[in-house]
Amino acid sequence: MADSGGIKVLSENRQARFQYEILETFETGIELLGTEVKSIRAGKVNLRDGFALVRNGEVWLHNIHISPHQQASAYYNHDPLRTRKLLMHREEIRKLIGKVEQKGLTLVPLKMYLKQGWVKVTLGLGRGKKLHDKRETERRRQDQRDIQRAIKRA
C-alpha cells in the first residue's frame, strides 16, 4: 500500500474510529529501538489497545504491542509492551495538553506508517462514543451502502 508521497501504511487501528469520535489528528515521530524498527517494518505491530498520555511536557505511547524480532537473540530484543516516547514540537504538545484536559477527550493511535524511511504515528484526539452513537454510525453507513447499491442497479 505505497502512496505517491512515499508513505507505506504498516498498521491501522480501525477499531479506534468505531469506539471514538475523532475530532483532530496529529502526525508524530516515535522513539524506537533497532529491533522494534525491524519488527514494525515486518508488520508485527498491534495498535488496538493503545493510548497516549502527556506527562512532564512529553507525549508517551502506552499498550502498543510490537512483537520481538525473530532473528534477534533474547538478550538484544525489546520488551513488546514498553512505553514509547512520541516526538512532537513543543507548541503542538502545549496545544494538546489544553485539549486532552477537557473532560472525555483521549489520544489514540490511528495509524503507523513509513514516511521517507521514518516510522510515524498518526494520533487522533477523540471522544468516546456511547452505544447509541455506535449504532447510529452503523445505521448511517448501512444506509449509504443501500443508496450506492440502488444507484448501481439503476
Swiss-Prot record:
It comes from the Bacteria. InterPro entries: SmpB, SsrA-bd_prot, SsrA-bd_prot_CS. Residues 133-154 have a biased composition (Basic and acidic residues). PROSITE patterns: SSRP. Keywords: Cytoplasm, RNA-binding. GO terms for molecular function: RNA binding. GO terms for cellular component: cytosol. Residues 130-154 are annotated as: Disordered. One of its GO terms (biological process) is trans-translation. It is found in: Cytoplasm. Required for rescue of stalled ribosomes mediated by trans-translation. Binds to transfer-messenger RNA (tmRNA), required for stable association of tmRNA with ribosomes. tmRNA and SmpB together mimic tRNA shape, replacing the anticodon stem-loop with SmpB. tmRNA is encoded by the ssrA gene; the 2 termini fold to resemble tRNA(Ala) and it encodes a 'tag peptide', a short internal open reading frame. During trans-translation Ala-aminoacylated tmRNA acts like a tRNA, entering the A-site of stalled ribosomes, displacing the stalled mRNA. Belongs to the SmpB family. This is SsrA-binding protein. The lineage of its organism: Bacteria, Bacillati, Cyanobacteriota, Cyanophyceae, Synechococcales.
